[in-house]
């Protein structure tokens, strides 16, 4: 028996090697992971206490509606609880949107390169995918995306800041785009890296929800909040959009400890502010290192940098892996001669900067680059 045709040939997600496997394979004592854009400072100390306190309740099913977390998020964003869509990470919210609004008779518009889950989930639903190449500076080509919208377009995806290059759109650009998109087409603005943004005119997207009924804003606890291992994400939309999606959401899609941890993380605003400040300092340090060596670094508003090395990304990835640094090759991200590097903590970044010149020089010598 064959699966439905749109998923035949789809490759499964390929996770990176665990740190312990890398140590064993290459005989390393220390391995620094700078690949998945996790928070190198972990989560708020309040999270560990909340999880410990909640561990005795794991025999219970979680609150399937996530009532306490909804109330806290609604208060934070000044929206109604009914405007929230809770997901097992924003990956699930993306899946729910595609399942709810896309069919083989419809199409969806997205930038490329961008976050891969938009295309994957749209493909599974059989929708036609219209990919619009980003501009040379890495930003979304909103004019071209607008031109691609037709009567059958149901979702337009705007990853802001964009993953994998970190480039962000300003509020004026986004509002001009939203003004032109028909209300029959959702505009999903994925703000996974919102807490790291320093751009002065970055959109206050949640505040735009009342003016633009087609707008959906995505946020996550996986990045700055340091809860990647617990999988909590959410969407904010008009009540009617959230109402239509709710029946598609699996019951108990967030576990009981995830709810508890997210609540604790949300309350510790000082921790998030400190992480943002340290990320800014360390990002500037890594950027200066790469630029001093003549490499182009995309202007990132996130906790990662996309760096054009001029060497095939898989080759650079392998060389650093053998020396104890797990990076992300740009070859699978749409940037074949780039690497994406997550911003580590001070010690991790200093270790990288100390070792990287030797690795890069050896690579260039071996390739005659």
From Swiss-Prot:
Q: What class of enzyme is it?
A: transferase
Entry GO MF terms: histidinol-phosphate transaminase activity; pyridoxal phosphate binding
What the entry lists under PROSITE patterns is as follows: AA_TRANSFER_CLASS_2
Tell me its cofactors. Answer: pyridoxal 5'-phosphate
Pfam families associated with the record: Aminotran_1_2
The EC number on file is 2.6.1.9
Pathway participation = Amino-acid biosynthesis; L-histidine biosynthesis; L-histidine from 5-phospho-alpha-D-ribose 1-diphosphate: step 7/9
> Which transformation does this protein catalyse, written as a reaction?
L-histidinol phosphate + 2-oxoglutarate = 3-(imidazol-4-yl)-2-oxopropyl phosphate + L-glutamate
Tell me, which GO biological process terms does this entry list?
A: L-histidine biosynthetic process
Please state what the protein is called. Answer: Histidinol-phosphate aminotransferase
Keyword Transferase present in the record's keywords: the answer is yes
UniProt modified residues of type N6-(pyridoxal phosphate)lysine:
223
Q: Does the UniProt entry include the keyword Amino-acid biosynthesis?
A: yes
Q: Which UniProt keywords apply?
A: Amino-acid biosynthesis, Aminotransferase, Histidine biosynthesis, Pyridoxal phosphate, Transferase
Q: Into which family does the record put it?
A: Belongs to the class-II pyridoxal-phosphate-dependent aminotransferase family. Histidinol-phosphate aminotransferase subfamily.
Q: Which PANTHER family match?
A: HISTIDINOL-PHOSPHATE AMINOTRANSFERASE, HISTIDINOL-PHOSPHATE AMINOTRANSFERASE 2
Xref: HAMAP family: HisC_aminotrans_2
Q: How does it assemble?
A: Homodimer.
């Amino acid at each position: 028996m064959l699966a439905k045709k749109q998923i035949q040939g789809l490759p499964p997600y390929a996770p990176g090697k665990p740190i312990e496997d890398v140590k064993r394979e290459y005989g390393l004592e220390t391995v620094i992971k700078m690949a998945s854009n996790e928070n190198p400072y972990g989560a708020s100390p309040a999270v560990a206490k909340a999880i410990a306190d909640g561990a005795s309740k794991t025999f219970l099913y979680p609150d399937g509606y996530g009532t306490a977390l909804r109330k806290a998020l609604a208060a934070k964003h000044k929206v109604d609880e009914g405007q929230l869509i809770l997901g097992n990470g924003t990956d699930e919210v993306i899946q729910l949107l595609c399942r709810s609004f896309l069919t083989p008779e419809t199409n969806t518009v997205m930038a490329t390169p961008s976050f891969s889950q938009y295309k994957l989930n749209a493909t599974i639903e059989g929708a036609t995918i219209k990919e619009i190449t980003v501009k040379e500076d890495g930003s979304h080509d909103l004019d071209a995306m607008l031109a691609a919208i037709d009567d059958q377009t149901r979702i337009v995806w705007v990853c802001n800041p964009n993953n994998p290059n970190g480039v962000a759109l300003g509020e004026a650009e986004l509002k001009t785009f939203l003004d032109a998109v028909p209300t029959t087409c959702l505009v999903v603005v994925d703000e996974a890296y919102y807490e790291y943004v320093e751009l002065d005119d970055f959109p206050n997207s949640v505040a735009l929800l009342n003016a633009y009924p087609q707008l959906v804003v995505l946020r996550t606890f996986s990045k700055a909040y340091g809860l990647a291992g617990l999988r909590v994400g959410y969407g904010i939309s008009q009540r009617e959009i959230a109402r239509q999606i709710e029946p598609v959401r699996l019951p108990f899609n967030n576990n009981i400890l995830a709810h508890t941890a997210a609540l604790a993380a949300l309350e510790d605003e000082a921790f998030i502010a400190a992480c943002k400040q340290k990320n800014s300092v360390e990002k500037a340090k890594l950027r200066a290192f790469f630029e001093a060596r003549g490499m182009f670094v995309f202007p990132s508003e996130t906790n990662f940098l996309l760096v054009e090395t001029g060497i095939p990304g898989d080759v650079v990835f392998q060389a650093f892996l053998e020396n104890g640094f797990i990076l992300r090759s740009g070859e699978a991200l749409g940037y074949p001669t780039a690497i994406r590097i997550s911003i580590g903590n001070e010690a991790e970044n200093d270790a990288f900067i100390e070792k990287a010149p030797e690795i890069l020089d050896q690579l260039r010598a071996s390739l005659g680059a």
